[in-house]
């Protein structure tokens, strides 16, 4: 009632009087003292709103009289107006609070509003005369107000007023938005030169130089009447917002009485709302739905902030992609609009995450508020920063994507999401041994899940590849790979893929909870040394689809020396042309949505001599060397480099140093320093069609967060270089192919039951299996136990498997379950960490099987089997005879090496408590002990299977080693007089009859 009383007094007093005003130009000054002419129009004004409670205060004029001739187009305004001026007045007064008192500038802007409504409004002749005179009087009032000295702002804030459509700003003296006009979607004006600083509600009135109270009352009725007509400039869904709504949330967002008190300047309209969700620092929380499709409340009109978080139901075809709310997805049923809350790994033991829980919703707000729209240029945000910027880890604005329950989400990401973060590292190690610590090189941050990267690509060159070293690396994991796996494992990173070509290695890691959304992983390599016959030079690559976007990582080692620039160009073209990938996605390297090209590219600095280069480095004038860098020059001349981008070279050249120091080459050769180690990226230009993943052309944006070298590592003559990138996806394909369900805790062996649901598009294989991993596992084969995924249907597309008691780890710990797909060669479904608390007192009895063989005295030299051509713990694909272990996909090409986890005492065998090799009974359909799971295999045969006679007794891997297989004839059990072989001995069994339990060779 208070707002209505104040606004009611404003209408007849200050804003728009309802009395007839003379229609000619010269009558205005003569009619000012007279109030009798206006008396006939006071009754409609009273009917349209409450009576005036403070008429004298609202009649206060602003400045001295200034007679100005009105515009000539105002009379034409009346002739085109078919609508009565006072018709909608009662509607606005019934449902909305009338505008509070305002200065004469308000009347002038209301007449501007009247101009908009006059083209389509219908007014009778008596009202037409009022409309003719009102603009004239207000024109004089505006000019006189702008010409006079401005008093201090009024204690009561004025109201936002709509003006012409081309004005998009606010009045600096306005404090709160006007409810009746904010919902209509009209633009707000910032007219500091024309606005009187004192409100009509000021307690110190001054004589009116222009209008009488009744004449101002006329203008108030006309301005209020013009509001519905101006709404025709808006879309249909915004017209509806002008209809009064009694909903409290809308009132709170549109008007706050507290902010109308006090002389405060108003922020822009998008920030003037009292709702904290609309403030620039507000972080949209993914788990809090913005609106529901059933909500009848419509959103406000487009604002300066690109994120629309007001409640409302978007009508089809009326909402632009740039204004999509974080939870709006076109074409998705209403029940799928609200995403489930993000899981927070690794502490909430629950179910399989349906998406990548990469970000906690409680992140601090990003410093930047502006959010790039999905339709912006894909490579626009990836431009190089200014050269004067230091390559430091400055914060970058990024975005988050909520996870839907549909197959993909098409909404723009939220402001609070730091995006998908990728760290790329390149290092020419110069055949050196790995250092002790690489934490700073990998930018792992504080170890918190919200710090650091989501994916890390590591490219190494000149890894020791001598014959004896290569033979050792063929049997054992190379030391560099072990170093990075050991360093990244505690940070929840898992090795996704790796490829090696002599001394060139590429390792790709990702957080374990991203694995279900990384698909179609493939590798390739190209030799360019000695005409393509030697792999000391060339390139290795890993490509994959991350959340539906095709990414490719290319690690190259190109020819050296100053005069080999053209040869480097030819080698790069050869690598791009020869490396092709299979599948429906991108085939060539440049066909991917995003390509990272890095390595020891060996580009040098031309023209300048050694002394000038060192002087520029010592004086920190690196920009003088940029224009003579061969790669920078090649970007402008080589067509093959079109579209590749690189950050500023704000770090010193990374080659060549004396090993063990930070001094440049002091040998007799005195090599000139150069930026040989580089990291570039290229975003595929939008072609107007779908991306290789089948989505829209505007797919992602790339921003380089940092680009620097690491001078603290001195083991090589090169310094490692690292770059951090932030990827902002326009959509995320974030639905796992398999969802695993498990209890929060396994306190008894009977609880070791796993249920999983598969998507209809998932191509299952009989080689699929489910592994049990400790938190911090290093790669997909680093499991504690496993069970074959037999796909026995339980309910619809829900399946169930059970881990045997013998395969379960004893004691207490945090574990993760993962579904390994043979076709995808990666975990396509994982759970959140859960607890296993099994009593350790049962370990002795459970570790003894029916053969009576004790596991005491067994050493920790469990052998891990790898295909010799594979640098990944994952075995190569094969269609040969099936093994009982997921680690044995093929037999003729197996290699042995002890696992580092075994050296630490952990079990790598799928059955940690029964690793003693028992004798297999003659009946090949039964076994004396269970392996992995006591249930039937995928083929329906009970228990573990025996090897067929075609498997040789000795695999001939090493002269001193011979692996015994199950006796094809079955044999008999151990007799009382037979001596069991020493399990610590690797020599062949003298009896030659020790059976090898099937699957015992598994990793």
UniProtKB/Swiss-Prot annotation:
Residue span of motif RSXSXX motif 5: 908-913
Motif RSXSXX motif 3 location, chain numbering: 871-876
Catalytic activity: 1D-myo-inositol 1,4,5-trisphosphate + H2O = 1D-myo-inositol 1,4-bisphosphate + phosphate; 1D-myo-inositol 1,3,4,5-tetrakisphosphate + H2O = 1D-myo-inositol 1,3,4-trisphosphate + phosphate; a 1,2-diacyl-sn-glycero-3-phospho-(1D-myo-inositol-4,5-bisphosphate) + H2O = a 1,2-diacyl-sn-glycero-3-phospho-(1D-myo-inositol 4-phosphate) + phosphate
Biased composition (Polar residues): 160-174
Modified residues (Omega-N-methylarginine): 56, 65, 83
Ranges of Low complexity composition bias in the record: 11-24, 180-196, 349-361, 390-413, 840-855, 907-919, 927-943
Intervals of motif RSXSXX motif 1: 6-11
Claim: Repeat is one of the keywords in the record: yes
Modified positions (Asymmetric dimethylarginine) in chain numbering: 56, 76, 83
Modified residues (Phosphoserine): 171, 292, 325, 900, 987
Annotated spans, Required for ruffle localization: 726-837
Annotated stretches, region: Catalytic: 422-725
Motif segment (RSXSXX motif 4): 882-887
Sequence motif: SH3-binding, positions: 346-351
GO MF annotations, alphabetized: inositol-1,3,4,5-tetrakisphosphate 5-phosphatase activity; inositol-1,4,5-trisphosphate 5-phosphatase activity; inositol-polyphosphate 5-phosphatase activity; phosphatidylinositol-3,4,5-trisphosphate 5-phosphatase activity; phosphatidylinositol-4,5-bisphosphate 5-phosphatase activity; SH3 domain binding
Biased composition annotated in UniProt, kind: Basic and acidic residues: 284-294
Pro residues: compositionally biased ranges: 197-210, 338-348
Protein name in UniProt: Phosphatidylinositol 4,5-bisphosphate 5-phosphatase A
Species this protein is from: Mus musculus
Gene name per UniProt: Inpp5j
